[in-house]
Amino acid sequence: MPLIKFKPTSPGRRSAARVVTPNIHKGSPHASLLESQSKTGGRNHHGRITVRHIGGGCKQRYRVIDFKRDKEAIPARVERIEYDPNRTAHIALLCYIDGERCYIIAPKGLKEGDKIISGPNVPIKLGNSLPLRNIPVGTTVHAVELKPRKGAQMARSAGSSVQLVAREGVYATLRLRSGEMRRVLAECRATIGEVGNEEHNLRKLGKAGAKRWLGVRPTVRGAAMNPVDHPHGGGEAKSGQGNPHPVTPWGVPTKGYKTRKNKRTQQFIIRGRRG
């Protein structure tokens, strides 16, 4: 998909770049697969900010995605490819032969009219979903489960994929795009192919307002705050942070400091993404 640039009629248009998506459905989404969403502004039930830089944005409805793909041995036809405002990937509307419809993450190369199916012994074909134990080693997959029948959790964003590199006993070894090597149970499902809309990272919003449409608020530097608001705040003019190392607003070291504490899943990571 090519990029489109605009005439420089304003600073925002001069910098903007959009991805051309001619095959995306231009009409309304399927009504029965929509749910309402309410904005939180990053606040919890006490009204306190728990996630910073969230607020505003266009009103959106959630598209219910079938991440489990547990409707086995029933063929489905791709009715159309749609835009989803809640994720970077596009979604595909499926129509099963029994009349049921559902949304899935659209793989790269999937198009209207294609036939796909889920099950333990289905063909190795783009869009088909089956357990890792039945997928040939070396195959590129996406929408991978971390626990059997829990639903896809890995490789769901635009352009992402995972490669099946080995199988040993009840485990399958996956190579992530980050370079991490990870083991998951071979009973976990995955979908053949990689996620579409791979040029999403090439787009340029062009102006701050476009980011606000997405519900993202500005990020203020700690050094620009007062001492009451941030450990880096205060001082005369543009003074330094005053700490031996940069910290978060809560005093935790940042910029390279490792904070991952999850011994329960560490045993499944064969090689980390940093080598």
UniProtKB/Swiss-Prot annotation:
Record-linked InterPro entries: NA-bd_OB-fold, Rib_uL2_dom2, Ribosomal_uL2, Ribosomal_uL2_bac/org-type, Ribosomal_uL2_C, Ribosomal_uL2_CS, Ribosomal_uL2_dom3, Ribosomal_uL2_RNA-bd_dom
Gene Ontology terms: cellular component: large ribosomal subunit
Region of interest: Disordered: 24-47, 227-261
Keyword terms, alphabetized: Ribonucleoprotein, Ribosomal protein, RNA-binding, rRNA-binding
Domain of life: Bacteria
Stored HAMAP family: Ribosomal_uL2_B
A family per Pfam: Ribosomal_L2
Gene3D superfamilies, alphabetized: 2.30.30.30, Nucleic acid-binding proteins, Ribosomal protein L2, domain 3
Protein family (similarity comment): Belongs to the universal ribosomal protein uL2 family.
Molecular functions (GO terms): rRNA binding; structural constituent of ribosome; transferase activity
Record text on subunit structure and interactions: Part of the 50S ribosomal subunit. Forms a bridge to the 30S subunit in the 70S ribosome.
Any GO BP annotation: cytoplasmic translation
UniProt name for this protein: Large ribosomal subunit protein uL2
